[in-house]
């Protein structure tokens, strides 16, 4: 597992990506929990896949595609919550997205599961490489709760942001390349 975070400024000036559509899909599916006083959470094993993650991410995806009258070929990028490498690849396959549309967002292959930060970190990574007027299909997932789905369209303002981030070494790919490994003893010191 990993930890991470991403921050975005929302507003009406210098927009780098416009939100075109969104929707939510939820149910009471307790697949991941932490009881009061427990240091680490528990999960329901295989139940976490099909009735939880897949149901919600596919449900939100289908709703958004129907709502926008679009199909996967209409998008340049696909971002799916990535608790592991298998789940988003399988959902993308079921929906009809290509591996080329999905690959730039699969940070899980490099940093592990960043939990609730996953889709936002992936959006930041995609915005680092996208061009103006490209569409991004994005679906988050919150264990036991549901999924939120979004359609973004990049603008010409994105280019100036990319240049500024490159100068200050703030691109997601650069930050991943500059990682620092810690051994088990260092890990224990950092977590206790």
Indicate where each model-derived feature is located.
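Short, contiguous, pocket-lining structural segments
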Residues: 25, 45-57, 70, 76-87
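Short, hydrophobic/amphipathic alpha-helical packing segments
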Residues: 54-61, 116-120
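Short, flexible active-site loop motifs that bind/organize anionic cofactors or intermediates
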Residues: 47, 65, 109
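Phosphate/pyrophosphate-binding loops at sites that engage ATP/ADP/AMP, CoA/4′-phosphopantetheine
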Residues: 58-76, 95, 129-130
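Claisen-condensing/thiolase-fold acyl-transfer catalytic domains that form or cleave C-C bonds
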Residues: 76-192
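Condensing-enzyme catalytic core mediating Claisen C-C bond formation in acyl metabolism
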Residues: 1-51, 55, 141-144, 149-192
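Short amphipathic alpha-helical segments, especially helix-boundary/capping motifs
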Residues: 31-39, 63-68, 96-101
């Amino acid at each position: 597992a990993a930890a991470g975070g991403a921050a975005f400024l929302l507003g009406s000036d210098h927009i780098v990506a416009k939100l075109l559509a969104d929707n939510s899909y939820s149910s009471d599916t307790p697949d991941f929990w932490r009881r009061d006083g427990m240091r680490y959470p528990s999960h329901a094993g295989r139940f976490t896949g099909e009735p939880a993650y897949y149901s919600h991410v596919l449900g939100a995806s289908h709703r958004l595609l129907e709502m926008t009258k679009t199909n996967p070929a209409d998008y340049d990028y696909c971002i799916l919550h990535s608790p592991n490498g298998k789940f988003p690849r399988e959902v993308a396959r079921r929906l009809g997205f290509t591996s080329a549309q999905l690959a730039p967002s699969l940070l899980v292959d490099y940093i592990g599961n960043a939990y609730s930060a996953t889709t936002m970190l992936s959006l930041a990574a995609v915005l680092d490489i996208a061009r103006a007027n490209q569409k991004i299909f994005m679906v988050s997932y919150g264990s036991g709760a549901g999924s939120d789905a979004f359609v973004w369209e990049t603008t010409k303002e994105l280019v100036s942001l990319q240049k500024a981030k490159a100068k200050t070494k703030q691109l997601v790919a650069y930050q991943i390349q500059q990682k620092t490994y810690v051994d088990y003893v260092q890990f224990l010191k950092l977590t206790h």
